[in-house]
Design a protein with these regions (language model features):
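PRPP-associated nucleotide enzymes
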Residues: 1-267, 273
Length: 273
């Protein structure tokens, strides 16, 4: 029995619904087209059961908008019912191309604006959905994952806030520090997808003269935070690894951080056979 046949023995949680926010509209449409084609081509013995009603549709996208008032404030609106749905909300908090008018001035949307729009749509759902999953490719405030002085832990607060609003699962990609899921250890599911395979695949497909050997290629981490990923890639490909680290001046603080004192320093770590 194939995996697809075996998985269909499990009843759907609810009718599938995709809500791509304005920041993730294009990606949401691609996902929708893939799901429509995939489900249309699948055949299984339970497709006529009542539990699978609405399994095949022309589109799974549910229209939702976040219009703004002249003051710059906004509200979330869903154009159709989502009662009993298995909803997937998609948001790209790093999409700076979107703008809105504030007191006659044009403002670009910041990650804070996108996150607030996400919460507005969750609030508009009003707890009527069967399950809510948030897909956020770049985890909101993921760089603020630890406290090194008197500062806020924004990423942990955001995760706790989403769970408190009824979010069941949070899916992100290559989180800055996956240990931030300690903020919600017992509530909700937190998944961070590592893109190492897609990274290697993309390089191999787009660089025709690539030579993956220690004489022509090495893996370099741009800072200390990326060493884990660099170690994994260099180990898999059998390449040498290098890294840069910042030599900071800890006697001064400029714009809230210690400035780089001299320059970036490079280290090379050869592979062992």
């Amino acid at each position: 029995m194939s995996n697809s046949e075996r998985n269909l023995e499990t009843l759907p949680t609810g009718s599938l619904g995709i809500i791509p926010l304005q920041s993730c509209q294009e990606l949401g449409e691609k996902v929708d087209k893939y799901l429509v084609k995939w489900r249309d081509e699948r055949q299984h013995q339970h497709q006529n059961d009542a539990a699978f009603m609405g399994y095949k549709r022309d589109s799974y996208i549910i229209e939702a908008v976040t219009p703004r008032f002249g003051s710059g404030e906004a509200k979330g609106m869903i154009k159709e019912t989502v009662r009993g749905y298995d909803l997937y909300l998609m948001v790209d908090v790093t999409n700076y191309s979107l703008t809105y008018s504030l007191c006659g001035q044009t403002n670009h949307m910041s990650p804070d604006d996108h996150y607030q729009d996400l919460k507005r749509i969750i609030a508009a759902i009003g707890g009527k959905a069967r399950r809510i999953t948030v897909i956020i490719p770049f985890l909101y405030e993921s760089r603020q994952h630890r406290r090194s002085t008197r500062e806020s832990l924004d990423c942990a607060l955001a995760l706790q806030e989403l769970v408190a609003m009824g979010v069941d699962n949070i899916i992100t990609f290559d989180a800055h520090d996956p240990r931030v899921q300690n903020a919600i250890p017992l509530k909700g599911g937190f998944e961070t997808v590592q893109p190492a395979y897609q990274f290697i695949k993309g390089i191999c497909k787009n660089v025709p003269d690539l030579q993956i050997d220690s004489d022509h290629m090495m893996i370099i981490s741009p800072d200390e935070g990326g060493t884990g990923r660099a170690i994994y890639l260099s180990s898999v490909l059998g390449l040498d690894m290098g890294m840069f680290y910042k030599r900071r001046d800890y006697s001064r603080i400029v714009d809230g951080r210690n400035p780089i004192a001299v320059s970036y320093t490079h280290l090379t770590l050869p592979t062992t056979s």
